[in-house]
């Protein structure tokens, strides 16, 4: 029998479009941007299967760019599952969420895209 690597054990990067409008519906105005960050963390945790999710500063700035009440309706993010080099870490992997470049045509029609690592 050949040994197969598990789905959760490989280092991988994917691009997703997250519909924040759907996730923030019926949310109080003054809680929208913090809830958007929490929803992005929840999405990345589910997509990559890691408990340790780190949000990039640029992504945080983009969510908060129009204030606490006006996060973007949709956002294109790049989620990377990386190996944790820290010896005393609880998890073997962590997820890093960054902002992906939005094409000129807009977000419609974009699906999930696997990004090849350039090492």
Swiss-Prot record:
Recorded superkingdom: Eukaryota
Entry keyword annotation includes Ribosomal protein: yes
Keyword Transferase: no
Gene Ontology cellular-component terms listed: cytosolic large ribosomal subunit; cytosolic ribosome; plant-type cell wall; plasmodesma; plastid
SMART domains referenced in this protein's UniProt entry, alphabetically: Ribosomal_L31e
Keywords: Ribonucleoprotein, Ribosomal protein
InterPro entries (UniProt xref): Ribosomal_eL31, Ribosomal_eL31_CS, Ribosomal_eL31_dom_sf
GO biological process, one term: translation
GO MF: mRNA binding; structural constituent of ribosome
UniProt signal peptide: none
Similarity field: Belongs to the eukaryotic ribosomal protein eL31 family.
PANTHER family hit by this protein: 60S RIBOSOMAL PROTEIN L31, LARGE RIBOSOMAL SUBUNIT PROTEIN EL31X-RELATED
Identification of the protein by name: Large ribosomal subunit protein eL31x
Source species taxonomy: Eukaryota, Viridiplantae, Streptophyta, Embryophyta, Tracheophyta
């Amino acid at each position: 029998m050949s040994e197969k690597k598990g789905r959760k054990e490989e280092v991988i990067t994917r691009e997703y479009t997250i519909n924040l409008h759907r996730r923030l519906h019926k949310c109080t105005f003054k809680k929208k941007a913090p809830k958007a960050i929490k929803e992005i963390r929840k999405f990345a945790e589910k997509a990559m299967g890691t408990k340790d999710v780190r949000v990039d500063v640029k992504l945080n700035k983009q969510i908060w760019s129009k204030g606490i009440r006006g996060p973007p309706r949709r956002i294109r993010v790049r989620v990377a599952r990386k190996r944790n080099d820290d010896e005393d870490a609880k998890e073997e992997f962590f997820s890093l969420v960054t902002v992906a470049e939005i094409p000129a045509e807009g977000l419609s029609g974009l699906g999930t895209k696997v990004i090849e690592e350039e090492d």
